[in-house]
Amino acid sequence: TLLLRMCMMKTANLVAKFIKCQCLITGESLGQVASQTLENMAVTESCCELPLLRPLVGMDKEEIVTIAKEIGTYETSILPYEDCCVLFSPKHPVIKAKLEDAHTLYNALNVDDLIQEAFKNREIKMFSARNYVWENFNN
């Protein structure tokens, strides 16, 4: 899962730079899942060239669910499907990855060309919560 997250971060960087974003924002919350320990989040962040913001990092699940309901993303988040993190999740995930080891394994996969190919064949769809957030910010 951690190597997959490294790939996703590298891909997100390419897309973000292409659409001229100044940062990446994730929904990670410290300790919620195995990939979200300090050590593992450091590994994921090491693949990020842009500033990485984690506004939910110190929130518990209940707080995150409340926010998701407020911004209209909760119903989507509970749809029953197996995403890539579930399908490829190891039985005993690493919770304290070592940065050097993670990069050694990542480099052995030789996926950078695949990431470039995926980016080349990208399809970008833009979604904005700006109006919702702004309306609620002013109330």
Feature map (PLM): residue ranges:
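A short alpha-helix-loop-beta-strand transition element characteristic
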Residues: 72-81
